[in-house]
Curated annotation (Swiss-Prot):
NDH-1 shuttles electrons from NADH, via FMN and iron-sulfur (Fe-S) centers, to quinones in the respiratory chain. The immediate electron acceptor for the enzyme in this species is believed to be ubiquinone. Couples the redox reaction to proton translocation (for every two electrons transferred, four hydrogen ions are translocated across the cytoplasmic membrane), and thus conserves the redox energy in a proton gradient. The gene is nuoI. It comes from Bartonella bacilliformis (strain ATCC 35685 / KC583 / Herrer 020/F12,63). It is a peripheral membrane protein. GO terms for biological process: aerobic respiration. Residues 53-83, 94-123 form the 4Fe-4S ferredoxin-type domain. The lineage of its organism: Bacteria, Pseudomonadati, Pseudomonadota, Alphaproteobacteria, Hyphomicrobiales. This is NADH-quinone oxidoreductase subunit I. Keywords: 4Fe-4S, Cell inner membrane, Cell membrane, Iron, Iron-sulfur, Membrane, Metal-binding, NAD, Quinone, Repeat, Translocase, Ubiquinone. NDH-1 is composed of 14 different subunits. Subunits NuoA, H, J, K, L, M, N constitute the membrane sector of the complex. GO terms for molecular function: 4 iron, 4 sulfur cluster binding; iron ion binding; NADH:ubiquinone reductase (non-electrogenic) activity; quinone binding. [4Fe-4S] cluster 1 binds at C63, C66, C69, C113.
């Protein structure tokens, strides 16, 4: 009996008709892709993108040269040189370099920082033509922090209940 039913389905081309209607249903459904350079997709507040050094609202850099980020980095992509202690007993960095070629974007540096100085910001479009441009120094990191501070602060605030 099942052979007879199978022969009838084949004769009436039911599989073809089912496939045709499935294709038509998908053809008129909304497209799942976006037109990337002109449209941006959703980026989570936990996204780990381009690194940035943050400043306090008074303009002073946050990094206290504790070197925890350098110690915890599994790729050894961070190099820090601390300056001499200032009159108030605090230290600041003289050199803060990140080799973005080595970085694996794990976020350990951000988690280890006690003053939220080093963060991975929301920027994911930092492709370059020269490899040397992926060696970030302190000035480049501070510029990134200044450029993305509003979004970085919002992302940290949104993630605060889970820390």
């Amino acid at each position: 009996m099942s052979g007879l039913i199978q022969a009838a389905k084949s004769l009436l081309l039911l599989e073809f008709v089912d496939a045709f209607f499935l294709a038509m249903r998908q053809f008129f459904s909304p497209k799942p892709t976006i037109n990337y350079p002109y449209e941006k997709g959703f980026v989570s507040h936990r996204f780990r993108g381009e690194h940035a050094l943050r400043r306090y609202p008074n303009g002073e850099e946050r990094c206290i040269a504790c070197k925890l980020c350098e110690a915890i980095c599994p790729a050894q992509a961070i190099t820090i040189e601390a300056g001499p202690r200032r009159n108030d007993g605090t230290r600041r960095t003289v050199r803060y370099d990140i080799d973005m070629v080595k970085c694996i974007y794990c976020g350990f540096c951000q988690e280890a920082c006690p003053v939220e100085a080093i963060v991975e910001g929301p920027n994911f479009e930092f492709a370059t033509e020269m490899r040397e441009e992926l060696y970030y120094d302190k000035e480049k990191l501070l510029l990134n922090g200044d450029r993305w501070e509003r979004e970085i602060a919002r992302n940290i605030l949104m993630d605060a209940p889970y820390r």
